[in-house]
């Protein structure tokens, strides 16, 4: 929640998911990947080419190679072992205090034995995001399923790193609703905010 620490108002606006910024080449490639990985992971065990995954023929060879590498990274993630894809690009809303937040989750997986959930936010770039921002997703999903937050995992997955980089939200790093509400309360002076834990650094 670095953005929150710097500018509470802007952070609240970002959480409400305003209109996306103007598309750039990297952003368009990321969008293609998000669509393709949903197709690939929902068809595990099936031979699935880029065309079948919805990757447009208009992409150049370098971009197609990059998409394929990202998809292979996602498919081979140890994080996803024992999980099956449940939903992609799914929205959930949660009201915290006087603020209603809309969360769009890239992918949600269900553990095969039914014992828990895993939220994944795919990142095709390498700029790392503080993992405690996933706390809002965890609370929103847990509330929508009527399950405790302890049964919901969440992680950023950076697919551009060799083998993928996983930054998972730990139980200790999960912000509670009071902390999030305090952070979103307009007009609260910074010294009245509940202290926010620093994100845990993972290798």
Regions found by a protein language model. Name each.
Residues 24, 28-35, 62, 102-103, ...:
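Generic recognition of stable, solvent-exposed alpha-helical segments in well-folded globular domains
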Residues 67, 88-90, 141-203:
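Metal-dependent nuclease catalytic regions and adjoining charged, substrate-binding loops involved
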Residues 1-25, 33, 42-48, 90-99, ...:
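Anion-coordinating catalytic cores for phosphoryl-, nucleotidyl-, and glycosidic chemistry
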Residues 18, 125, 161-162:
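Short, solvent-exposed loop/turn segments at secondary-structure junctions
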Residues 91-144:
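Non-catalytic protein-protein interaction segments used by genome-maintenance enzymes to assemble
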Residues 16, 21-96:
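A non-catalytic, helix-rich entry segment at domain boundaries
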Residues 81-87, 106, 114, 148-152:
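A broad structural signal for short, well-ordered beta-strand segments within beta-sheet-rich domains
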Residues 15, 121-122, 156:
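Residue-level recognition of conserved beta-strand positions in structured domain cores
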